[in-house]
């Protein structure tokens, strides 16, 4: 799951100048880190044949380490635009059916959202860390044959 999202984000135009890795970002500007925060089962149903259907949400965090010299409002605006461009791209790719598929059933109901982009911290050395929450909702079917 994490590798699918990593490969997907690696295509994002907003990340072309960023070195993306699995794990935490930084400390060098121009780096980003992606990791999974976990999976939550939102709903579970079992039919008479014993097939279990789960609606799940996987949550990921993407942290970006970008340059932000103290008092530089132009760079702050560029960084904010960078986050917004990434969120918009994820929404467009999902709407076009080009987002990664995480479940094994009902792909038409799958969603992928990038949201809550924010500045986490900035230091006097001219570096800022931004975070973005990425949420995937998908459906998983389990049968006796499902490993």
Protein language model regions, located:
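A short, hydrophobic beta-strand-centered structural micro-motif
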Residues: 30-39
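Charged, amphipathic alpha-helical segments and their flanking helix caps
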Residues: 1-25, 43-147
